[in-house]
């Protein structure tokens, strides 16, 4: 019975099983148990199931949602399941080096922590806890404009410079002030998000929001994002739909940070990023 229980748990976590939630529920019914303690989690798929149980519906929806019917999320899972590791034998694996050097950043791990906003909604340590974990495991970190914690405090917690993810508002003077603040905090690169030209139809978030009977004002009232402190954001939009490739040159005129374009989806845009002087790109999936 012990081996059968272990087998079912590992099977539930397989990335080949794209409909994880339904399968996890079936396994839980078979085992007659449900994970309730994060210390019992052994993989990220179980963590997602536990998070759904522990996190308020609206907050879980914000974290888990895709766009429309979440088809892209499903396509991501399907796509990764088609990757296969090609093992090569009888090579010296006694000293394996996974370190990378990206735009002057030397990291022990090739896995970068991409920006996730509003982490204070999920843990009291918010981005400070993430920064400490990144430092402990040798991961580089990109901090969101929408972070719950200031870039200065996160940089101090990590003990090393981070990269800053930027939403260029429709007020250029605010964008310049955010760039200057990030650079003053020690950020070596700024990652300009370009794949959010307008509002998204986040069906999963909307659906779970309706199931949440809490008053959102209880935890959101008067909580301006730290990156917007000192800025006049009255009536401003988080993103500027009028941006063109010229923004790369404009940014380089006001900052010495590397300018990385985040949200590239087609090869033609990758070529344009190079043409207009971007120092790097982050491909959106």
List where the protein language model places each region.
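Acidic (Asp/Glu)-rich catalytic clusters
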Residues: 152-159, 274
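Alpha/beta enzyme core
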Residues: 177-285
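N-terminal secretory signal peptides and thylakoid transit peptides that target proteins
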Residues: 1-15
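Glycine-rich active-site/cofactor-binding loop and its immediate structural neighborhood
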Residues: 107-144
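Hydrophobic faces of well-ordered beta-strands that scaffold small-molecule active sites
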Residues: 111-114, 141-143, 162-164, 190, ...
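An N-cap/entry alpha-helix motif that binds or orients negatively charged groups
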Residues: 27-107, 202, 211-243
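Glycine- and other small-residue-rich loops at beta-strand/loop junctions that grip anionic moieties
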Residues: 65, 119, 123, 143-144, ...
């Amino acid at each position: 019975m012990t081996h059968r229980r272990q087998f079912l748990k590992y099977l539930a976590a397989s990335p080949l099983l794209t409909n994880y939630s339904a399968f996890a529920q079936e396994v839980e019914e078979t085992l007659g148990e449900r994970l309730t303690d994060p210390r019992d989690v052994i993989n990220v798929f179980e963590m997602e199931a536990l998070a759904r149980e522990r996190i308020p519906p609206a907050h879980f929806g914000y974290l888990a949602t895709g766009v429309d019917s979440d088809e892209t999320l499903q396509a991501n899972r399907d796509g990764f399941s088609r990757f296969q590791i090609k093992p090569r034998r009888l090579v010296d694996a006694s000293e394996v080096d996974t370190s990378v050097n990206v735009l002057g950043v030397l990291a022990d791990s090739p896995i970068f922590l991409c920006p996730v906003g509003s982490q204070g909604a999920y843990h009291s340590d918010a981005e400070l806890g993430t920064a400490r974990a990144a430092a402990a495991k040798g991961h580089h970190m990109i901090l969101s404009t929408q972070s719950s914690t200031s870039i200065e405090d996160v940089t101090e917690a990590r003990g090393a410079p981070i990269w800053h993810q930027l939403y260029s508002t429709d007020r250029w003077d605010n964008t310049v002030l955010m760039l200057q603040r990030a650079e003053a905090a020690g950020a070596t690169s700024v990652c300009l998000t370009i794949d959010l030209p307008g509002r998204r139809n986040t069906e999963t978030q909307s659906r779970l929001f309706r199931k949440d009977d809490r008053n959102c004002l209880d935890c959101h009232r008067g909580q301006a994002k730290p990156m917007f402190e000192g800025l006049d954001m009255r009536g401003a939009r988080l993103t500027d739909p009028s941006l063109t490739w010229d923004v790369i040159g404009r940014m380089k005129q006001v900052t010495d940070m590397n300018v990385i374009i985040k949200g590239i989806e087609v090869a033609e845009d990758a070529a344009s990023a190079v043409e207009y002087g971007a120092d790097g790109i982050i491909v959106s999936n």
